[in-house]
Amino acid sequence: MTDISYYNNEIDKILWNILGDDYFTQDEFDDLVNSVANTIYQYDNEVSIDKLKVIIEFVILNKFKICYIYDNDSILNQVKYEKKSVGSKTIGKNSTNDDEDDDEDIAVIKLSDIEAGENWFKKSPKISSKQFQSVDKVEVATYEDLISHKHDYPKEIYKESHYIRRNTRLDVIKKIPQFEQKSKEWLKQRTESLTATAISVVFDEDPYKHPIVILLDKCGRGLPFVENKFVHHGNKYEQIGTMFYSFRNNVEVGEYGLLQHSGHKFIAASPDGICSKKANTGGLSKLVGRLLEIKFPFSREINNSGDLDGDICPHYYFLQVQTQLYVTEMDECDFLQCKIDEYDSWEDFVKDSNPIVPGLSKTTNLEKGCLIQLSDKNLIGSDDKEKCLYNSKYIYPPKLHMTNEEIEKWISSEIMNYHNNDLSENYMIDRVIYWRLSQVTCNLIKLNKEAFEEKIPLLQQFWDYVLFYRQHSDKLDKLIKFVEKVKEDNSAEIFSYINEDFLSLNKDSKYEPLYQEETEWRKKYNQIKAKKAQMYKNKSYNKYTKFSN
């Protein structure tokens, strides 16, 4: 049987013709293997084509090291394979290095040693194409190799003007008083403004709500918020997303609560985070002032292609980010989307451990970890399982990339010392949840200030309507009855009524009714809604016809 060194030499020749000294990505790997295999098989068919592919995979992955490509401007997660080096030289067909250790190691391996490649592939799991991107060209031998240093700022003080401006603005934001949650001041602040999550609705560019819903809510007559599985899932894992982003980008991420625009107090936003200094050394970062918005979709697919506004980032989230940028007076936001899986057991969690890097999933090559779920004592035994879940609170680990032993010690410590936790009076430990990230995308969104400011007059008029009905509860009661009659999706008729009401007591106003024409986004949503309705109608008709016959 032909020795492995023979195939090593043949593969080298073909790779040089295809790649030269270039690299290839994970997405190109299968095509590369097929090309090399088909070429060799034309003149040497001693082994089957399938076994030949296994040999080629083995040889190539011994010659190339895995690197990560991280670029916030990119919509793709990629893995890059770059030629391994010996000393300071690159191994390749034209290499003059006399000490080519990697090739010598391959040469002494027999075909029987890699029988179908099974043992080797078990030891060296491939990196998933869903891997979070990293610009740093490093072999991952430790979790610290996962940190991107792309955004580290090398100087002791900021020199570039845009970093100086962001840092100065961040200092101002840090000094803004933050009120205790649920306090009178906290509640009052929320009644004084339209928050970022409401802006898409006020623009009539939200698929789920119509503008009148926000107006009634701001007048204290809206439906009470009821948490659902989608909101709870996002809130539950938001801190994990922050920890992941902070670690991978070597940056501290701070939370600053609800912020109001300096000139338009009726517009407010609360970003998930704002970046500041480097996390590991406290030095400067080029990410200073960049906002972070995190989404953990419960069922929505994460899209990596198409338009940033609408396809990759759903339009209502895009407007949320634009509002956050406008309010904070920053210019960039990273939109981080993560898919997360929960393990069924500790045993499954342990089995899925990366053999080299603690805290990485062997399956996804993304972070994994745990958190402790706490349940409300007053709801123990309740038949309302959803209410029990949505009232849960969580204890998060101090860091990512803990070894399994460290995780066990942390869980034991939290349980033993839980009586010292402030939450222990009203909450009890329910269970430990083990999770892994399965997909991560990070896309840079920049402020379009001109486009946003074009909508300020609409927001101002809408807010004037809110203030008007707050002062005239009798007219608000009549408005509610009118909305019940015409239905909340009839925005044109509702806001004609509202504008007439407003002008009756504001004779000098030049306001024209809002929402007299459908926005382009509303048209798009209505088309999608109509298609779905027709689809369900057809299904129901077919089902009826089937049973009728």
UniProtKB/Swiss-Prot annotation:
InterPro entries according to UniProt: Lambda-type_endonuclease (IPR017482), NF-kappa-B_Signaling_Reg (IPR051703), PDDEXK-like_dom_sf (IPR011604), Restrct_endonuc-II-like (IPR011335), YqaJ_viral_recombinase (IPR019080)
A Pfam family: YqaJ
NCBIfam families in alphabetical order: phage_rel_nuc
Protein name in the entry: Uncharacterized protein R354
Organism: Acanthamoeba polyphaga mimivirus (APMV)
